[in-house]
Amino acid sequence: AISFVAVWSAGILEQASIPEAWKNSGLLLVALKYSGSALICCYLVAGSLPFIEQAFGIVTDISLLELTGVSHPLLQELARRAPGTYNHSMMVAAMAEAAAESIGANGLLTRVGAYFHDIGKMMKPEYFIENITEGTENPHKSLAPNMSTLIIIGHVKDGLELAEENNLPEALHPFIAEHHGTTLVEYFYREAARKADSDHRSEADESNFRYPGPRPQTREAAVLMVADAVESASRTLNEPTSRRIQSLVHDIILKRLLDGQFDDCNLQMNELRRIEESLDRKSTRLNSSHANISYAV
């Protein structure tokens, strides 16, 4: 349509009269020809886009937008098998997108990456706290800390395998692999250390309780790492006031900074500050909203 109007408008300028331009069958034919060519090109580009992305290892905004409708089979299966993880992922996506945009990173890519970052949890959903309903016994009570850690860490490997099997764009794989970096699974490490101390055994080996990594390689993956941790931790606050959330966000970012988790992604200190401010605002709003809903029920 645009091509037709452009060619026909040029004809009007030459003819100096709209009626004369309409009577000029040659001009109309040229306009229609250019319109048809443009339409065919659009179809060819749209049809070949998946092959281009796969060949060059890129993902376009068009493909990402198609994944924002959360109708992908993997997300539908995640919602069915691990509803707590699904809800967590949706909240993390909203937080991470805003934080990424606050530093000029790719918010859309970060949002879609957040949708899929925890898909591996659907393989053993009952072992993740967000899927353990009230009144249900925590399965970790009957497991040694080392075994619990292997299960928790395993969701990253499971997620990458699911991504491969379901042909998720390569650009989304790092969000699955890197969202925990090489961080420590602190709860089970402390449990192992406590048991080792009470049994008068040697100290627990910290390396056995760390994710294998890699650490975030991009700013987008680093943003997701922080947003993921903030959303999970904020749900444990009895009274999620603005001040408590601010302190929580600051502590999470500082801990990961000192642990070297941002060393490979070129994040600047002023960007970390903007990420912190964005997550403060978004977390406060989300927790306030949830508190209101809970109160109403």
Language model feature labels by segment:
Residues 27, 31, 35-36, 40, ...:
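Non-transmembrane, amphipathic alpha-helical segments
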Residues 75-88, 93-242, 246, 255, ...:
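Divalent metal-dependent catalytic cores for phosphoryl transfer on phosphate-bearing substrates
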